[in-house]
């Protein structure tokens, strides 16, 4: 059967997008993998780099530390975010939008900023550590920030919004008819929670854990700022490449860093397919009932979460406009004088804005075209499946990983 003009155009666009994704994703990863089997001179040496890495006890400690930080941070963030999302979806408290927007604030800041704020708050000369600069000594609290404690706090703050978004959606689409049937049978709230609520959002829990794990596992900013001497894989990559100029070993660490992320991401994709068949058009939206004791608890809990988030941003804001934090808190704009640094802050902002704008336009266009071409076809071709896979692969990749080969 002869193809129509529209079908020919769609095939051409599909091949173009596939070629584009191959250039920006497959080629860098291919070069990265090839580099891991070479020495710094470019000679093929097989698995020697991997053997050297795994026989070094110090490098194995980094892997162990990374797995520990990722697991603990993911569990804590899920507990906090689920409780927060439950307060949004299953209570009758007021100001839900305010709580939600404040809880989402960390999403718009890098983990490096979170780490810097924590240093100003809980570092050796931090506001909380010194009892608010010895004005409230009774409130002084040293949490021993530098190391796993600081990394976990910074990572939880970073991944909290992403986990909250997933769990908030999962709770919002639970079928209310199940609760109505349970009420008719006289089921207690405790039993409804464990037999209806949790089973219905189990895929949300799995997805949120995997997202949190990947983001933490591949993050560089928080360990760099508050990690101290506590090594993780992301900082190992930086040390190998920038500090030691050992590109081959940096590629090895990058591959090791990539494997758990890809496995976790593939599991997440399988989970999402199962999640899509749980709900249907006949599902009813959950309608929470009034409960003063429950609502009071969530008012307190969500206020505490929001106060901590606000304190992080306020600390950064105040320190930026202070003459010399924490010794001289006099208002000053001298910290914004970048005129001696390669053109000044205007040039920095201009370059960042242009890069973000171009990336946003190109990324949005390519993503829309890819989604349109794939979803508008009744039968998916091999090219369509490859486009889908290559489009989601970057979500499982560390930010710096694809650039190691350069």
Where are these regions (language model features)?
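Transmembrane helix boundary and interhelical loop/hinge segments in multi-pass membrane proteins
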Residues: 43-46, 167-180, 189, 202, ...
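Glycine/proline-centered hinge or cleavage motifs at structural transition points of membrane proteins
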Residues: 185-187, 199
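Membrane-water interface segments at the C-terminal ends of transmembrane alpha-helices
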Residues: 9-40, 55-172, 200-221, 252-269, ...
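Feature of multi-pass inner-membrane transport and sensor proteins
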Residues: 191, 228-234, 263-296, 327
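Short, Lys/Arg-rich, polar N-terminal cytosolic tail immediately upstream
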Residues: 1-6
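Glycine-rich helix-loop "coupling/hinge" segments at transmembrane-helix boundaries
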Residues: 220-244, 326-329
């Amino acid at each position: 059967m002869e193809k129509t003009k529209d079908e020919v155009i769609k095939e051409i666009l599909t091949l173009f997008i596939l070629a584009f994704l191959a250039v920006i994703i497959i080629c860098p990863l291919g070069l990265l993998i090839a580099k891991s089997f070479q020495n710094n001179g470019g000679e093929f040496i097989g698995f020697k780099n991997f053997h050297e890495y795994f026989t070094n006890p110090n490098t194995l400690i980094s892997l162990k530390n990374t797995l520990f930080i990722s697991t603990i941070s993911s569990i804590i963030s899920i507990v906090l975010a689920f409780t927060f999302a439950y307060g949004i979806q299953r209570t009758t408290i007021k100001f839900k939008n305010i709580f939600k927007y404040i809880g989402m604030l960390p999403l718009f800041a890098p983990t490096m900023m979170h780490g810097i704020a924590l240093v100003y708050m809980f570092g050796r000369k931090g506001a909380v550590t010194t009892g608010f600069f010895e004005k409230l000594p009774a409130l002084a609290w040293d949490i021993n920030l530098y190391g796993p404690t600081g990394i976990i706090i910074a990572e939880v703050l970073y991944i909290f919004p992403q986990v909250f978004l997933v769990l908030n959606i999962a709770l919002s689409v639970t079928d209310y008819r199940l609760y109505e049937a349970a009420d008719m049978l006289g089921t207690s709230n405790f039993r409804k929670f464990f037999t209806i609520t949790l089973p219905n959002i189990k895929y949300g829990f799995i997805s949120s854990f995997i997202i949190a794990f990947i983001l933490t596992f591949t993050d560089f900013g928080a360990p760099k700022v508050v990690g101290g001497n506590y090594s993780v894989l992301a900082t190992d990559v930086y040390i190998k490449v920038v500090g030691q100029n050992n590109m081959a070993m940096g590629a090895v660490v990058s591959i090791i860093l990539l494997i758990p992320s890809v496995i976790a991401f593939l599991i997440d994709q399988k989970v999402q397919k199962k999640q899509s068949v749980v709900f249907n058009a006949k599902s009813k939206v959950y309608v929470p009932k009034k409960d003063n004791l429950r609502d009071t608890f969530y008012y307190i809990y969500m206020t505490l979460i929001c106060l901590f988030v606000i304190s992080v941003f306020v600390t950064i804001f105040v320190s930026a406009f202070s003459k010399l934090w924490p010794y001289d808190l006099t208002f000053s704009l001298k910290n914004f004088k970048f005129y001696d640094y390669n053109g000044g802050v205007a040039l920095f902002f201009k370059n960042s804005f242009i890069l973000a704008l171009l990336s946003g336009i190109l990324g949005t266009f390519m993503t829309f075209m890819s989604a349109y071409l794939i979803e508008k076809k009744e039968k998916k071709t091999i090219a369509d499946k490859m486009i889908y896979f290559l489009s989601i692969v970057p979500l499982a990749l560390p930010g710096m990983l694809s650039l190691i080969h350069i």
